[in-house]
Amino acid sequence: MSSLSNSLPLMEDVQGIRKAQKADGTATVMAIGTAHPPHIFPQDTYADVYFRATNSEHKVELKKKFDHICKKTMIGKRYFNYDEEFLKKYPNITSYDEPSLNDRQDICVPGVPALGTEAAVKAIEEWGRPKSEITHLVFCTSCGVDMPSADFQCAKLLGLHANVNKYCIYMQGCYAGGTVMRYAKDLAENNRGARVLVVCAELTIMMLRAPNETHLDNAIGISLFGDGAAALIIGSDPIIGVEKPMFEIVCTKQTVIPNTEDVIHLHLRETGMMFYLSKGSPMTISNNVEACLIDVFKSVGITPPEDWNSLFWIPHPGGRAILDQVEAKLKLRPEKFRAARTVLWDYGNMVSASVGYILDEMRRKSAAKGLETYGEGLEWGVLLGFGPGITVETILLHSLPLM
């Protein structure tokens, strides 16, 4: 009988196996789907709804301040998975600090994978291949932590095969739309034939609470965040005539800006998610973003452009001030952030799902205008995620010709 060592492959055979396991090409975005809840809230009347729902109408001056905050956001409307009648069932959620985590979990644990599944179904339909061909699922959310986790529940709702490789990314915040693309690139390029379904789904009820004069940070968050989900199909070596790749994911980098963990931070408590934001966050991000951009270009041997206007842009719309200051710092023309500002106006800040919406907005408008590429007619672009840490995700994209 042969020994175990004699039956195993030689080192050169192992290298051959390794080479065969890897894809030949770069990971690409092949399909995009989005979904949002049915309840729409216009921003210009949101202060009335919010103060009424939280029994806070007697706080007249605070309401005026909140209304002013809402009107400065450059948000037109947002979507939520609740309305006023729904909130009446949960008085602890609409208080400021009553224990309410159980109620919030009861809403988010089933709601997050359900909303994510809606977006995933649209992405799979656009992709055009059977869902049985999905090999990996990456699910991302900042709410509804549970076991089995949201990736398991989404796979179950979609009816994916039992051997799909699943990953769940919890509690990363607003930069996570970039994080999931970084994960998906590694999975697609290191597993020949892999097709990665990426799902980001967010429900903001985890941080909804009554206004409080001593915690205006939370009120700012409540004026910005909206509910939504985005899904992408990512894979290498697209099948010609079947799959329609739009963007190549050329390089991904994550950077933590030193000594900034107190600038944006959130904490899960019995009262839900508590949100804290420094006034200096837009400046901190804008002062560091160019270094992140230069790093991602140099890491692949490309000289950074002298004029950042030569690129298309997918920045996370963390808020008007962040977009304004990054735009100014990089000396970008106003139209460069058009897609991001459109998504911010139409949906608010949907945390990890936002950049998926912006990719969708950009590719649709590019097609409608008859441009040469999905990236507003340009070949090269950048996707940026900003969030707690402060963490920056920088992704170098190469847009393919419109098909």
From Swiss-Prot:
Binding annotation for CoA: 68, 277, 281, 318-321
Modified-residue entries (Cysteine sulfinic acid (-SO2H)), positions: 174
Record keyword tRNA processing present: no
Disulfide bonds, paired cysteine numbers: none
pH note: Optimum pH is 6.0-8.0.
Reaction catalyzed: 5 malonyl-CoA + 4 H(+) = 5,7-dihydroxy-2-methyl-4H-chromen-4-one + 5 CO2 + 5 CoA + H2O
InterPro entries assigned to the protein according to its UniProt record, in alphabetical order: Chalcone/stilbene_synt_C, Chalcone/stilbene_synt_N, Polyketide_synthase_type-III, Thiolase-like
Residues of the site described as Determines the polyketide chain length and product specificity: 207
Catalytic EC class: transferase
MF GO annotations: acyltransferase activity, transferring groups other than amino-acyl groups; protein homodimerization activity
Active site per UniProt: 174
EC numbers for this chain: 2.3.1.216
Taxonomic superkingdom: Eukaryota
Pathway given in the UniProt record: Secondary metabolite biosynthesis; flavonoid biosynthesis
A Pfam entry, by short name: Chal_sti_synt_N
Family as reported in the entry's similarity comment: Belongs to the thiolase-like superfamily. Chalcone/stilbene synthases family.
Self-association state and partner proteins as the record states: Homodimer.
PANTHER family to which the protein is assigned, alphabetical: CHALCONE SYNTHASE 1, HYDROXYMETHYLGLUTARYL-COA SYNTHASE
Functional note: Catalyzes the iterative condensations of 5 molecules of malonyl-CoA to produce a pentaketide 5,7-dihydroxy-2-methylchromone.
Further information: A.arborescens is a medicinal plant rich in aromatic polyketides, such as pharmaceutically important aloenin (hexaketide), aloesin (heptaketide) and barbaloin (octaketide).
Identification of the protein by name: 5,7-dihydroxy-2-methylchromone synthase
Organism per entry: Aloe arborescens
